Every structure is written in structure tokens, then in C-alpha cells.
């Protein structure tokens, strides 16, 4: 039996998108996950959304957990860090939110009932569907967002340069 947590049956991957009332965000995040899945066809890969689209993060996460994986890699499909990637997503996952965001949220009006103690009570744009809790005893690896990567610069150049 393979006990390597890098093996496909031990590791799940969750792509997290923002979500939108319009279909485009969901379609793009799903397409990115599908394209990635073509490179890792043996891995269980799911997509979940912060808000305004289904499945939400707990539903997608718990679907992966139900496959018996020992660890789940959560990757936010966001260009840059923000309150969602630094506070909201970690809180939903039961991880500690990044302490550096609190200075920016004073008076923001989107606090989680004024306290943080390891579980999620809901989010300002979420409705009652966000009551599902994450149930997982394994390892959660939470990656950085996309960032100012050379691959992004190349894509922007492909869009802009023909018009120069």
C-alpha cells in the first residue's frame, strides 16, 4: 500500500473562485480546473466558490474529503491577496486568518460577528447555504494566489501588444 501523501488517492485539490451572479467567473474557474485536471488526471479535483455560485467551499471541500484523501491542497484562483484570501477562505477552512488584514477591516462592517475562534459563522454576502461545516482530520495546504507571475505578464502582452 502506498503511504506517500503525494499519491493521487491521498491528495485532493480544491480550486477556489470568488463567484458571481453572472456565469463567467464560474465558467473560467471551472475551465482552469478542467485544464489542470488534464495534467493530473488521477487526482480528485473540485471547484468551490466564496459566494454567489455553487458549490460553495465547504460543499466542494467535503466532497474531496469524502474520497478518503489525507490532505487537500486549496488554491485560490485570485490574482492578488485580499480579504477573501487572507481572512475569509482561511476562516471557512478552519485555518487561522492572516493577522495583517485586521488593520484594514476596522470599520469595514464585514466582521464575522466580531470574533474569530476557529470556525465560520457566515460571511457578509453569503446566505443560509454557508452553514455547512468542513469535516476533515487531514492536512490542509493553502497556496498563494496567482500573483505577479511572468506567465500573467505574457498573457497581458498577448492581449495588449497587437494593439501597440
Task: Name each model-derived stretch.
Residues 1-164:
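Active-site-proximal alpha-helix that buttresses catalytic centers in soluble enzyme cores
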